């Protein structure tokens, strides 16, 4: 037996083991390859199944969502249908307040659905409901607008003249109407501060007022009955037209306060937009009348004072509103005041013209046509006191007196008139200047008639050239008597005031001095002598004294005779003249008489009057 090598044996065993392992590994690999092939086939088979399963899951979710959406839309449709049924009953059946409540609910539902619109982008039924809601809301809001308009139209255009004549207030909405308008306006304003209802309110109210004012326009544009007829105060239809405009403005203020009581911030806009066309219509009629006045200033000029009052009233009523047509009012006011101010100058020029037309002095030295015309015109001015005062604002004396006027002929100097004089003071000054102008020009014309070959010396009681002072003084004072009578019996007395009356007294004093100027010359005769004692008078001195008494007697009797001819009728003027003559004459005559009454053997031959006689004769003449 051969001996076995151990190492070879180990190698053999190991080789056999490796061979066996290799075979097993090969078999495992074959199995793994088969498994891999089978897995790939399974993956190909189950992939579509899994994908379909996922699709089915998605479809399930969509179906569930759709079912929920359909249920939700059904609920919304049912809810909307309830509100729609109520709204379709209409405002008259449902009532205005419930109608707006239901409409608000529908509006809220629409807003909620619009916000959630993204969840229903492919739901045609949802969009149909949304569209229907919008249409229903729009239709209901249109009903509200129509209701608002119908309420506004419950007041129809009317003739304001009838209401004013019957003293009936302009039509106004009932509390219920105002409450309903407030409900409607509140709905739209709360919704979006929409200005639609404001615009409707502005349009309807403006149209109603314009149509009402149109009733009065034909009468407002008629100033006088005919072109050549003088205007009578208060006769123009424009005055009532203005009263109606002021009534409309006041009415509209109250209405807007009531309707928009909860919306103070929009009141100014609404009122401004309503009144703008009203003011424009007012200005249009006013300018039509002003054109007529300018073309017929002699007959219709005084109407401009009433126009001034009318404009002033409207300006005050719309003050602070910032109207678009505010400038129209301002321009109209300026044009009217230009006319009224021209009347002041025209009046002064007219006085001069009328006095220059005087060709003879009245035979009784009485009232002249110029005086009658002047005072008639000034009395007319007094009927328009308010308009005159308005026209006097911000003007000066230069408006009616030229800068070259003779200041000495007037009873007040320009330096005495302040730059900031009140309208009342300026009006008094104007009236007094008219009277001064009348008197000064009467004197100037009288001097020209009586002394045609010399330049008149006016307003000068001491003039040596004026040989007719007494006659001229009497002429002026007789005319001033009429002036004072008219002043006292009219509003001129108030308009002149204390200063104006003082100026009249100053004028009277001037021409009383004219009347007593000859009396003053008479007293001068008594002064021209050397005063010596009666004892030891020379014969020559006595002759001079006799001559002075003779001249005095003749002069006194001549003056008394002339004074009687004038036939003064004014008691106050008589008393004033008597007082002036006595005060001027008696002190000198008393002194002269006392010194020389015993100078003659037969005093009565040379001295015809004692001081008491003189006083009595003067008193009898001027009683």
From Swiss-Prot:
GO molecular function: phosphatidylinositol-4,5-bisphosphate binding; small GTPase binding
Keyword annotations from UniProtKB, A to Z: Exocytosis, Protein transport, Transport
Claim: Protein biosynthesis is one of the keywords in the record: no
BP GO terms, sorted: exocyst assembly; exocyst localization; Golgi to plasma membrane transport; protein transport; Rho protein signal transduction
InterPro entries listed in its UniProt record: Cullin_repeat-like_dom_sf, Exo70, Exo70_C
Top-level taxon: Eukaryota
CC per GO annotation: cellular bud neck; cellular bud tip; exocyst; incipient cellular bud site; plasma membrane
Compartments, as annotated in UniProt: Bud; Bud neck
Keyword hit for Transport: yes
Function: Involved in the secretory pathway as part of the exocyst complex which tethers secretory vesicles to the sites of exocytosis. Also plays a role in the assembly of the exocyst.
Family per similarity comment: Belongs to the EXO70 family.
Protein name: Exocyst complex protein EXO70
Designated gene of the protein: EXO70
